[in-house]
Curated annotation (Swiss-Prot):
The keyword tRNA-binding applies. It is an enzyme of class 6 (ligase). GO terms for molecular function: ATP binding; magnesium ion binding; phenylalanine-tRNA ligase activity; tRNA binding. One of its GO terms (cellular component) is phenylalanine-tRNA ligase complex. This is Phenylalanine--tRNA ligase beta subunit. The keyword Ion transport does not apply. Binds 2 magnesium ions per tetramer. It catalyses: tRNA(Phe) + L-phenylalanine + ATP = L-phenylalanyl-tRNA(Phe) + AMP + diphosphate + H(+). Belongs to the phenylalanyl-tRNA synthetase beta subunit family. Type 1 subfamily. Keywords: Aminoacyl-tRNA synthetase, ATP-binding, Cytoplasm, Ligase, Magnesium, Metal-binding, Nucleotide-binding, Protein biosynthesis, RNA-binding, tRNA-binding. One of its GO terms (biological process) is phenylalanyl-tRNA aminoacylation.
Length: 795
């Protein structure tokens, strides 16, 4: 809501500065976004009267004028504006004046004619008004008056960002009421008396949807001069509120909306066939709107119609064929209360957003319509003339809102505010806000005023008391609470440690949406029904994810399309698994996932560029697993996964259970996602790896370590990791490490077999190992793998 400070002060004028005013209303919950001057910086500009206006003898487009600015002599001024004419009241920049941009007015000669000043346009004075030529002031503008004072240009516009619950402040009336409450100042509304009817013309009003329109007022005004000029004071008030002047009738309805908070509309009476009918639209009924667009109406849209056709979308937008035009003689003024539930969302469904719909869908004061009708009639007669008919009203009292009655407990107020405000102050604040207050045993019973739709529960009253009392007036008091030491579980592996490790290995953390495209998800996790959202952001984000892999693959595609071929990403997040036995039928499992694609390392002149493969990702994942309590107990077993390459996929195993998966993305999936090149992913259950070994101090052996390499021939289908793990178990305390360093298949190795070269590191903490000790340990290892896997030492 943008408004003029000077207009507000016509209603309520507390003894505070502009800065104090904006701070005050911000602290009261009406956040001020911006404060701007209504005009540029200038001085020396006066109201003038063009006494003479003649053609310049040497220039077709210039006029020579004599202008009265209230001084002893008339000023000779040369003007190039086409609308300059004798008798016009104008804004005159006299010699010595300074205009915006530090432009100084001096005596000059234009084509040989003296010019001692300048006749100004709006733009030349930094006033944001679209116009051609110089300003045309009202005939009663006082000659010689300082122009800044004449238009009250020592003013600012204040832009307030109103929350959806404060619809009562979408008007000068509402803002003045709020400022008056904050300052205990009287609010003076303009005097509006009932306009006496001079003709008896009426129109029938048939409200067929009383729940949507409990009150509808109509009044005929005949012989209206729509060619009249909107007074400059009204144009300025509209401009400072962000609304441009259109014609006097529209300007008046806009003015009443801004001043009173009641949207209104004016119809051309000659274009109405029969009477007014307020009804729901027929499905696909068509209406041409004021902007020339055609709307195909839905059956839940309330319309204002006559006996033959729809005239306007109620509370939203008028129709082109019933609006006021330059040929209009008689008008029908409309003033109604539309139920917010029947207006909310209608404008948006037709791609519209209007000042009227914004107010009606939040709630307009349902006691305001008669006063607003009289105010609009008063202004219309003053500006455009006309013969006024009586007001015709159609009302359904049963469908009008009922004032909310809300109980406020003393105990609840003190608990939420943390401060005891005296009873008398609480009552005074609520009454200043327009509420009727009754004292009860536990506190108070307050009846909300007709303009406050947002007062519905006890907390609303607490908020009102708190903000008017002033949150800054509530003393600071530190909460008193016992400090309990939280137990620190050293065995828990911090997520930050894993994040740091992956970042150190060249990964970047990604955060993708938990909402995914359901059909695409079926490619990654087929055969599992995901939770479908009843009200999704979009169709592409309508399912809860079953895996983090989908989001990471889409992120890879996003980066590849932006010339980022090397991608290394990881993500920690939840997956959502339907489970009838779980709370709310859904298991939320924390997962850790990663993806790599592109070159193995950054491009370098001294390094060969190679593409990542399965073992790059496996190495990174093993580094993560090494941090955990079972770092040596994890294994990788070949598996089949619908999203992964059939020959390059493995299940991550621990204690005989699969806790994750790693592998190269299936070529068909690469094609459907639009991936460019080989992409490797992993996903693992976080709860299965989030423990670590508690560090224990131990002596470091001072005796030498011994390495022995063995080559074992085993069946080709036996996993290398199983062989290495068997070596570790059989080696006992002397075996410090066992590492696979070569796999050979070919000449010298029987077909269907493979040779595994394993480095064994043996060491004792008590003594130097003898050759016999080493040989015995190696022999025990060979016998163990031979018995378990049929392995044999390679010759």
């Amino acid at each position: 809501m943008k408004f003029s400070e000077s207009w507000l002060r016509e209603w309520v004028n507390p003894a505070i500065t502009t800065d104090e005013l904006t701070h005050q209303i911000t602290m009261a919950g009406l956040e001020v976004d911006d404060v701007l001057a209504v005009a540029g910086v200038f001085d020396g500009v006066k109201v003038g009267h063009v006494v003479e206006c003649a053609q310049h003898p040497d220039a077709d487009k210039l006029r020579v004028t004599k202008v009265d600015v209230g001084e002893e002599e008339l000023l000779d001024i040369v003007c190039g504006a086409a609308n300059c004419r004798q008798g016009l009241k104008v804004a005159v920049a006299t010699v010595g004046a300074t205009l915006p941009g530090d432009f100084k007015i001096k005596k000059a000669k234009l084509r040989g004619q003296p010019s001692h000043g300048m006749l100004c346009s709006f733009s030349e004075l930094g006033i944001d008004v679209e116009s051609n030529g110089i300003m045309e002031l009202a005939e009663n503008a006082p000659i010689g008056m300082d122009f800044r004072d004449f238009l009250s240009l020592n003013d600012v516009t204040i832009d307030v960002d109103l929350t959806s619950n404060r619809a009562d402040c979408f008007s000068i009336r509402g803002l003045a009421r709020e400022v008056g409450v904050l300052n205990r100042a009287d609010v003076t509304a303009p005097a509006v008396n009932a306009i006496v009817a001079t003709i008896n013309d009426t129109i029938s009003i048939d409200v067929k949807a009383p729940a949507a329109c409990p009150r509808y007022l109509g009044r005929i005004v005949k012989n209206v001069n729509v060619q009249a000029q909107t007074p400059l004071w009204m144009q300025e008030k509209l401009r400072r509120c962000g609304i441009r002047s259109i014609d006097p009738v529209v300007d008046i309805t806009n003015f009443v909306m801004l001043e009173q908070g009641q949207p209104m509309h004016a119809f051309d009476l000659a274009k109405i066939e029969g009477g007014i009918v307020v009804r729901l639209a027929e499905q696909d009924e068509k209406l041409t709107l004021l902007d020339g667009s055609e709307a195909k109406l839905n059956a839940d849209t309330l319309v204002i119609a006559d006996q033959q056709k729809a005239l306007a979308i109620a509370g939203v937008f008028g129709g082109e064929h019933s609006g006021v035009s330059t040929d209009t003689k008689d008008v029908l003024l409309e003033c109604a209360f539309f139920a917010p539930d029947h207006i909310r969302g209608r404008a948006r469904s037709y791609g519209l957003h209007t000042d009227s719909s914004m107010r009606f869908e939040r709630g307009v004061d349902y006691a305001l319509q008669h006063a607003a009708m009289e105010r609009a009639t008063q202004l219309l007669v003053e500006i455009c003339g006309g013969d006024v008919a009586p007001v015709v009203a159609a009302e359904s009292a049963a469908d009008l809102p009922k004032p909310n009655q809300v109980a406020l407990r003393r105990s609840k107020l003190d608990k939420l505010l943390g401060h005891a405000i005296p009873d008398a102050d609480v009552v005074e604040i609520l009454e200043r806000l327009g509420m009727q207050v009754e004292t009860t045993a536990e506190g108070w019973q307050a009846t909300a005023p007709t303009w406050r739709f947002d007062i519905a529960i006890e907390q609303d009253l607490v908020e009102e008391v708190g903000r008017i009392y002033g949150y800054n007036n509530i003393p600071n008091q530190a909460p008193v609470a016992a400090l309990n030491m939280n137990l620190h579980n050293e065995a828990k592996l911090p997520l930050k440690r894993v994040r740091d490790l992956l970042v150190d290995r060249g990964y970047q953390e990604a955060i993708t949406y938990s909402f995914v495209e359901p059909e695409q998800q079926k490619l990654v996790v087929p055969g599992v029904d995901a939770l479908i959202l009843p009200n999704p952001i979009s169709a592409e984000m309508s399912a809860m994810r079953l895996s983090l892999i989908q989001g990471l693959l889409n992120t890879v595609v996003h980066n590849q399309k932006r010339q980022q071929p090397r991608v290394r990403l990881f993500e920690y997040g939840l997956r959502f698994i339907p489970d009838a036995a779980a709370e709310n039928g859904m298991r939320q499992e924390p997962m850790l996932a990663g993806v790599i694609s592109g070159a193995r390392g950054e491009e370098h002149w001294n390094m060969e560029t190679a593409t990542v493969d399965f073992f790059d990702m496996k190495g990174d994942l093993e580094a993560v697993l090494e941090l955990t309590a079972k770092g040596k107990a994890y294994s990788f077993a070949a598996t089949k996964h619908p999203a992964l390459h059939p020959g390059q996929a493995a299940a991550i195993m621990v204690d005989g259970k699969a806790i994750g998966v790693i592998g190269t993305v299936h070529p068909e999936l690469e094609r459907k996602f639009g991936l460019n090149g080989r992409t490797i992913v992993f996903e693992i259950e976080w709860n299965a790896i989030n423990t670590r070994v508690i560090p224990e101090a131990a002596a470091i052996s001072k005796f030498p370590a011994n390495r022995r390499d063995i080559a074992l021939v085993v069946d080709g289908n036996i996993a290398s990791g199983d062989i290495v793990e068997a070596c570790r178990v059989a080696g006992g305390e002397l075996l410090k490490d066992a590492k696979l360093f070569d796999v050979y298949v070919g000449k010298g190795v029987e077909e269907g077999k493979k040779s595994l070269a394993i480095a064994l590191t043996l060491q004792s903490v008590e003594r130097t190992l003898e050759e016999a000790d080493i040989a015995a340990a190696v022999e025990a290892i060979v016998q163990a793998v031979s018995a378990q896997f049929g392995a044999a030492l390679r010759d």
